[in-house]
């Protein structure tokens, strides 16, 4: 919260000013970007319309769950109709090579803008598949267990799919998750992991660790791990280091190339706003793709990872496309890539991830300040770290005195959307693209009324 207090001081604002939210919105250079999005309206979201005032029925909701599914950018509708559907109608199969966005190169068009989101070279990223599939794809290449080095390290309480994928990869390689999967637990009475404890576990298991596979931001607690330091230590013990960035991509500043991360993957429907189930993304550091040898490379192969010049030739030996593109197996969905391209264009309009992260720090700090200073109950506990460099937009709130699921229902009747994770945690994410400071103030007002 220190960054928020520093901002208030630098802007000569007062925390006790009743119009503080108005003044913060006036200072917000990104305030107009929310006009780029469609918002659900209250009558379509509320659980009990009898509890909604008539004048509020058609009001846009306050959407605080972009960490689960981002709002729809208006640009997606435009590009799907005017580009994808129009080109398919107009050109048919020739659309692979005609039009402003030929189908055959549709994913390559996104590489440059996607690389800026995660701090990579364009050649190191590729939109493809879905997140869980991509974890399998990348682990099939990077997890090469031996009798002495066979362990995968994840965090305790990782997103279930990360657990299922790592367990199945271990079994697929004829090892036992009971002995080959290490889960790092928080200390007793704590919800988040201390960096020193993570490092100690890595060093304790040392040369028995094949892969370190953590979440960049922990989905339940909202903790942003020290990826740079953890990657360094992982390499010191001789392990490959990969990251699940589902809750980090589009949320915080990342420098995957400079941090020397081996691989990473993420979905694009949360903070990147591409749409439910839309195409995911991968990162493979350039050091791993400088050369390709079919006899020694263990990646899973498919026709779209093959060089375009070789792709339709019968009985030709596979020659990998350069960089991350060589990990593709199937042709990407043109509709998905069109949606992702459109959603990424909104990031460009906003000035990029750096500006968004700056606003995120301030607006999330404002949310934390109101929760700790203006809430009239002690039945709400923030379990997300207070330090700005250890979180993104999400604050996870442990709720007491009322079931979190019931509180979510009550808030929906007030035109507020957030989500619940058991046991009794509400996740609140003031995504900087479409959340105002007055939105945050209203949330606290309604939280007070419903606790």
Curated annotation (Swiss-Prot):
Its EC number is 3.7.1.3. It is found in: Cytoplasm. It comes from the Eukaryota. Keywords: Cytoplasm, Hydrolase, Pyridine nucleotide biosynthesis, Pyridoxal phosphate. One of its GO terms (cellular component) is cytoplasm. The modification N6-(pyridoxal phosphate)lysine is found at residue 270. One of its GO terms (molecular function) is kynureninase activity. Pathway: Amino-acid degradation; L-kynurenine degradation; L-alanine and anthranilate from L-kynurenine: step 1/1; Cofactor biosynthesis; NAD(+) biosynthesis; quinolinate from L-kynurenine: step 2/3. Its cofactor is pyridoxal 5'-phosphate. InterPro entries: Kynureninase (IPR010111), PyrdxlP-dep_Trfase (IPR015424), PyrdxlP-dep_Trfase_major (IPR015421), PyrdxlP-dep_Trfase_small (IPR015422). GO terms for biological process: 'de novo' NAD biosynthetic process from L-tryptophan; anthranilate metabolic process; L-kynurenine catabolic process; L-tryptophan catabolic process to kynurenine; quinolinate biosynthetic process. Catalyzes the cleavage of L-kynurenine (L-Kyn) and L-3-hydroxykynurenine (L-3OHKyn) into anthranilic acid (AA) and 3-hydroxyanthranilic acid (3-OHAA), respectively. PANTHER family: KYNURENINASE. This is Kynureninase. It comes from Dictyostelium discoideum.
